[in-house]
Structures are given as C-alpha cells and as structure tokens.
C-alpha cells in the first residue's frame, strides 16, 4: 500500500517536469522570434503608411451633428515615436535646466522629428517660458491651468539662453503660457529672454509666439522692441467658433489688433499667425480669416489639423485631407502671404528653422549689410 502510494505520488512529478521543460522550450522560441522580429518602434512607425494608403482611405472623416463617437485617426496623422540621441539630449538638458517646452506640454505630434532633427538633421525646439501652468483654459489645449500659477523663475532667461547657445541652432521659437496674474502678463520676462539669447549669439533668429496680454499694447510694444525677428500670435480658429474654442478672455478682433500693432511698433518684424482646422469651420469662414490676417499685415500663416489631446477636450469634427490643406496653401499664397505652411501635421512652430521664414530673414539681413558697406571712391 505504501509502495503504491509512492509510485502514485511520483507520477505527477514526471509529468510536471516534462510540462515545465516544454514551456521553457516554447518561451525560448518566443524570445528568439521577438529578437529577430520587428520591435516596438517598427510597429509604431507603420512603414505601410504610404501615400497610396492615404488616397485609398475610405474611413469616416466628419462627425455629424449629435454624434458622440470619436472619429478614427486617418493614416496621414500617424507619426513615429520620438527616439534618437538628439531627442534624448535635448530632453535631458530641458530637465537639468528646469525648462518647459510646448512640444511636450501641448503633446505635439512632431516632437520626435523636431527634437531628433528629422531627415535634414536640423533640430528645432520650442521653449515654453514662465512655467508649465497657464491662467487661461482654452478648450483645445492640454497645458495645465490655474488662477495663480507659481512665481516666475528669475533664472529662466539666462538658463534658456545658455541651453540654446549650446545647441548651436540657427532659429529658435519662444512661446509662453498666459500669465494674467502678472501686471505686465510676463512681457518683460519674455523680452529679457530674447535679449539674453541675442547677447550670446546675435545671428540666431528668434521667434516669439506670445499671448494677447489682454490687449495691453504696452506689453505688445515691449515684446516687439526686444530684438526678436518674428512676432507670432495665433488666431487659432474662425471668428464664429472663437468663443467656443478659446478662453473667454481671448477675442478674435483683439488678436488681429495685437498683430497689427506689433507691426506698427516695429515695421521690420515678420508677423505670423496660425489656424486650426477640423473644429467645424466652413471654407468661407477660413477664407475670411485668411483675409482678416492679411488686412492686419500678417506675413506668414500656418494651417494644421486640430487633434483632441484628451477626452476632456473638444472632439474633432472633421479630419481635413492633405489635398484640402494643399488648397489652403495655394490660396494663402494667392492672398499675398510671404509664406503659407499648410498640412495635417503643421503647427505654428513646426520645424521653424526649415521654413521659408529663415530665407526671408537671411535675405533681409544681407540687403541690410550691403547698404551699410561704404561705396569705394
């Protein structure tokens, strides 16, 4: 009886050992297949995302009135995950110097390309000044909000200039949160940052994407005369949708006034604005917005697809096709903008150093230098 129990007890052990051996072999086989197969980056990169796939896409691109379900992301809006040494270097330095970027805070889809350098190897980063918390609550933006954000970092202008100087960039974009809690909206802080950057490298082109300062023209003047090259302020959407999309303190006509006055304070500035598409605007409204910007003297305009950052933000009404964006690029150029950047993934500061603005500024500088050279007797 005891012998029988022993034999009976040993049998499962043999079976269990064989099962464990089989499982180990399967696990090793899976590991080998994973090592030889595509990695996570390959999966996200989606190499099949070709123009043919764009043209053949027959998914729904517009939500009808009353529909709650979100639209599926079309193939032309899928981007690669951010990787690479350049990306890691910039991110590490941002943390070390306690700097914020709109690239991260606004969850920009182009962060990997801009920080990594893209196919041309030019790095572009958009520094967000005055912290990562905004006093406004626009319904399209994922930046944190509060009525009274933390105090300004007095070392930020120097830290920002130090970082930018070490990168060796030709073009830098400075943006900021709104700081309605400050008497001057932070305009002097931004201007000081520009001066620090220019003191270290007078050849670098500086673009400032700034708030409306609640229409305070003294603040606009402070920025316009700080030494920057490009004054940018975004109109964001068409006039009809402005109260629905932007914070209640932001006004369509106020934005146009800010852009107009910036040019009046400094006629040598290039002025720039941006429009998001896909929020329910009509073609006629887009056309009128472009005309309003031109009448305000705006030189450059960008048009890009609105993408819902979280479930708490405005839903996308329509995914605009690349062909439609091409139409608006052509229309913008017809209206007389010096440069029109229009595409699904275009953002106000997207690859700023590679845009036409750089060549405009370089040509202006060359003409200025030529006129300053004394003629030979």
Curated annotation (Swiss-Prot):
GO terms for molecular function: 4 iron, 4 sulfur cluster binding; lipoate synthase activity; metal ion binding. It is found in: Mitochondrion. Binds 2 [4Fe-4S] clusters per subunit. One cluster is coordinated with 3 cysteines and an exchangeable S-adenosyl-L-methionine. GO terms for cellular component: mitochondrion. Pathway: Protein modification; protein lipoylation via endogenous pathway; protein N(6)-(lipoyl)lysine from octanoyl-[acyl-carrier-protein]: step 2/2. Residues 119-338 form the Radical SAM core domain. Its EC number is 2.8.1.8. GO terms for biological process: lipoate biosynthetic process. Signal peptide: none annotated. [4Fe-4S] cluster 2 binds at residues 134, 138, 141. It is an enzyme of class 2 (transferase). It comes from the Eukaryota. Belongs to the radical SAM superfamily. Lipoyl synthase family. This protein may be expected to contain an N-terminal transit peptide but none has been predicted. This is Lipoyl synthase, mitochondrial. It comes from Drosophila melanogaster. The lineage of its organism: Eukaryota, Metazoa, Ecdysozoa, Arthropoda, Hexapoda. The gene is Las.
């Amino acid at each position: 009886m005891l012998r029988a129990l022993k034999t009976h007890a040993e049998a499962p052990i043999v079976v269990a050992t064989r099962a464990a051996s089989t499982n180990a072999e399967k696990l090793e086989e899976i590991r080998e297949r994973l090592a030889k197969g595509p990695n996570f980056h390959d999966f996200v990169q989606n190499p099949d995302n070709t123009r043919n796939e764009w043209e053949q896409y027959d998914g729904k691109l517009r939500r009808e009135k009353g529909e709650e379900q979100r639209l599926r992301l079309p193939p032309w809006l899928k981007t690669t995950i951010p990787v690479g040494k350049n990306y890691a270097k910039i991110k590490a330095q941002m943390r070390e110097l306690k700097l914020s970027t709109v690239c991260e805070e606004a969850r920009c889809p182009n962060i990997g390309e801009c920080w990594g350098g893209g196919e041309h190897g030019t790095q572009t980063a958009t520094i967000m000044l005055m912290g990562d918390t905004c006093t406004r609550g626009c319904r399209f933006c994922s930046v944190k909000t509060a009525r009274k954000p933390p105090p300004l970092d007095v070392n930020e202008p120097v830290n920002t200039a130090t970082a930018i100087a070490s990168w060796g960039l030709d073009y830098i974009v400075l943006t900021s949160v709104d700081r309605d809690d400050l008497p001057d909206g932070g305009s002097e802080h931004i201007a000081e940052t520009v001066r620090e950057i220019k003191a270290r490298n007078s050849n670098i082109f500086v673009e400032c994407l700034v708030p409306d300062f609640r229409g305070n023209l003294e603040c606009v003047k402070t920025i316009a005369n700080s030494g920057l090259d490009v004054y940018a302020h975004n109109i964001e959407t068409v006039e009809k949708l402005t109260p629905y999309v932007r914070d209640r303190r932001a006004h369509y006509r106020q934005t146009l006034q800010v852009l107009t006055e910036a040019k009046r304070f400094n006629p040598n500035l290039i002025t720039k604005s941006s429009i998001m598409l896909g929020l329910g605007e009509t073609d006629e409204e887009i056309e009128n917005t472009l005309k309003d910007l031109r009448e305000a003297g705006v030189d450059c305009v960008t048009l890009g697809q609105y993408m819902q950052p979280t479930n708490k933000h405005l839903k996308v009404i329509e995914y605009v096709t690349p062909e439609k964006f091409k139409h608006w690029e052509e229309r913008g150029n017809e209206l007389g903008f010096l440069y029109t950047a229009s595409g699904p993934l275009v953002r106000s500061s997207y690859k700023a150093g590679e845009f036409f603005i750089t060549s405009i500024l370089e040509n202006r500088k060359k003409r200025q230098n030529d006129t300053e050279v004394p003629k030979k007797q």
